[in-house]
Amino acid sequence: MQMLTLAQQAKIASIELAQFGNVQKNHALLTIAEQLEQRSAEILAANAKDIEFAKNQGISTAIIDRLLLNESRLQGIANDVRNVAKLADPVGQVIDGGVLNSGLKIERQRVPLGVILTIYEARPNVTIDVASLCLKTGNAVILRGGKETKFTNAVLVEVVQQALETAGLPKLAVQAVTDPDRALLLELLKLDRYIDMVIPRGGAGLHQFCKENSTIPVIVGGIGVCHMFVEKSADQEKALELIANAKTQRPSTCNTLETLLVEKAIAGEFLPKLANRMKALDVTLHTDDLQKTEGIEPLDDARMRQEWLSLDLNVVVIDNLTKAVEHIREYGSQHSEAILTSDYQLARQFVAQVDAAAVYINASTRFTDGGEFGLGAEVAVSTQKLHARGPMGLEALTTYKWVCEGDYLVRK
């Protein structure tokens, strides 16, 4: 199919979809959840083909982990769809308004954006997450997954489209581009007459490609070079458990801890404890502040600007909070940053000085997630400042219009 035709169909579907209320949209979402469960064997069989292809291509274990679906993960996706159905529909919500001195009644109402293009790599869960959030907010969506998710996405999109038909909603409100040819993506990125927003979910290269080639507004984010600063007053035993959670719970995610900053005053006491705890969890430390033994490698400055997405952790000894903030400004990606401390004033100073979508005091960076933030399944995590920042839930997929009413009112 020509990309122009696909985008035109999406635009028409978005106009139709915007006319449906919350009841019809929720019916479609609940049908999607049911179909995911009923067709789980078919979905997992397709996913197994994608996993086999990925292994044959020598794709990293971190990427394969993102690609993998199992019964538990698939059930989690279905549950997320049901949770989206339970959320309040932001469309039509009156943000603010009133009657002006002129007598004009004015309201600012939330409305769908229109058509969303989402580009992602080895993340089949994104197919359903994005589709459900877009449907809830009355947006059509074009899904362009990576070649690694070819078989899984084909089944998932079929499930969604059948659910839309069952619910009486436009089937073409959710479409997929299955051809991995990048020339087709380039064509899509120029169709600003029909597509209203581009959301890339992948590595830094994908985000840069979209920024450089799109005539459509692009949401930049998802690159998580996340830091945690252990200040000298921190509870060291609790800190070790929190660091373990932030690094090892699911290393391949963008909200995983990548660089640990330790205040110099406690480094001699804390670093040996850290080394023992991380060794027990098979985490390799990259640092110049510990004797090189098994599980400890030299620090690589270039790697401090990248996501590990694996059981690797940079460790840097820092003089004080000011130096920690300077380090984060130099190496961070404005995603999620944390401080562990018992000093409230220093904590507030850290929050004020660190520029990131999410800043944590004595909590794991792993909380930067739409579900954990109470937003439902997220469409992305934005690290930019315009339109949306942080986990993007339902409201981030809407814009607003001014609705003005008078009694044949004229401007004087």
From Swiss-Prot:
Name the Enzyme Commission number(s) assigned to this protein. Answer: 1.2.1.41
The entry's localization annotation reads: Cytoplasm
Q: Decide whether keyword Acetylation is in the record.
A: no
InterPro entries from the xrefs? Ald_DH/histidinol_DH, Ald_DH_C, Ald_DH_N, Aldehyde_DH_dom, Glu-5-SA_DH, GPR_dom
Print the keywords alphabetically.
Amino-acid biosynthesis, Cytoplasm, NADP, Oxidoreductase, Proline biosynthesis
Which SUPFAM superfamilies does the UniProt entry name for this protein? ALDH-like (SSF53720)
What Gene Ontology terms describe where this protein resides (cellular component)?
cytoplasm
Catalytic activity line of the entry: L-glutamate 5-semialdehyde + phosphate + NADP(+) = L-glutamyl 5-phosphate + NADPH + H(+)
Q: Hey, which pathway is this one from? A: Amino-acid biosynthesis; L-proline biosynthesis; L-glutamate 5-semialdehyde from L-glutamate: step 2/2
* Major localization listed first in the record, in broad terms: cytoplasm
Name a GO molecular-function annotation: NADP binding
Q: Which domain of life is it from?
A: Bacteria
Q: Which GO terms describe its biological process?
A: L-proline biosynthetic process
One protein family per Pfam: Aldedh
The family note in this entry says: Belongs to the gamma-glutamyl phosphate reductase family.
Q: What does this protein do?
A: Catalyzes the NADPH-dependent reduction of L-glutamate 5-phosphate into L-glutamate 5-semialdehyde and phosphate. The product spontaneously undergoes cyclization to form 1-pyrroline-5-carboxylate.
HAMAP family on file: ProA
> In its UniProt entry, what is this protein called?
Gamma-glutamyl phosphate reductase
Name the source organism. Answer: Actinobacillus pleuropneumoniae serotype 5b (strain L20)
- State the gene name recorded for this protein: proA
